Structure formats: C-alpha cells, structure tokens
Amino acid sequence: MILEHVLVLSAYLFLIGLYGLITSRNMVRALMCLELILNAVNMNFVTFSDFFDNSQLKGEIFCIFVIAIAAAEAAIGLAIVSSIYRNRKSIRINQSTLLNK
C-alpha cells in the first residue's frame, strides 16, 4: 500500500474521532471516539515503522504499549461511567458535574 493512502486514512480516522470527542454528549460515545483516535495513532506507528525502518520493531512495540494503555483506559473509563450511571441515572457529560456539589 502507498504511504500517502495510509496516512490519509489515518488522518480521516483521527479527525472523525476528534470531531466525535468534541461534539459528543454521551460518555460512552466519547470513550469510543478516544479509542478511534488511539487506533489512528497506532496506524501511524506501524506505517512509519514499516516504511522507514524494517530492521527494528520500534513502531510495533509502541503500538503494543498504546493498545495496553487503551485497554486500561477503556476499563477504567467504563467503570467510572457505570458508577456515574448508578448514582445519577444518566451518562450525559453535561449532566454529570460531580465536582460542583
């Protein structure tokens, strides 16, 4: 695959995730958009590692670290969302101002 095609696809994924993160009012949707952004970053790591330095696996190792961090982030985020839903009966971002009270 051509480098430019992969970078354009990764940029589209990143921008879709960023747009969704900025405009979403649902916490679960915001977490999904954050995962989309992290997957676009992973795509860039693997692409640049494949195209520019085949002898070392630095991009793939960074990708594995990002996947591990994203899994931990998703688990913690969903635990927080379920706790907020149990207490507030809503997962909308603008209704869950826990620090104001």
From Swiss-Prot:
Family: Belongs to the complex I subunit 4L family.
Swiss-Prot/TrEMBL catalytic activity: a plastoquinone + NADH + (n+1) H(+)(in) = a plastoquinol + NAD(+) + n H(+)(out); a plastoquinone + NADPH + (n+1) H(+)(in) = a plastoquinol + NADP(+) + n H(+)(out)
Gene Ontology cellular component terms for the protein in this record: chloroplast; chloroplast thylakoid; chloroplast thylakoid membrane; plastid
E.C. numbers: 7.1.1.-
Quaternary assembly: NDH is composed of at least 16 different subunits, 5 of which are encoded in the nucleus.
Sorted UniProt keywords: Chloroplast, Membrane, NAD, NADP, Plastid, Plastoquinone, Quinone, Thylakoid, Translocase, Transmembrane, Transmembrane helix, Transport
HAMAP family assigned: NDH1_NuoK
A Pfam entry, by short name: Oxidored_q2
Membrane topology of the entry: Multi-pass membrane protein
Organism: Arabidopsis thaliana (Mouse-ear cress)
NCBIfam families (alphabetical): PRK05715.1-2, PRK05715.1-4, PRK05715.1-5
Name of the protein in its database record: NAD(P)H-quinone oxidoreductase subunit 4L, chloroplastic
Transmembrane stretches, start-end: 2-22, 32-52, 61-81
Superkingdom of origin organism: Eukaryota
GO biological process, one term: photosynthesis, light reaction
Gene: ndhE
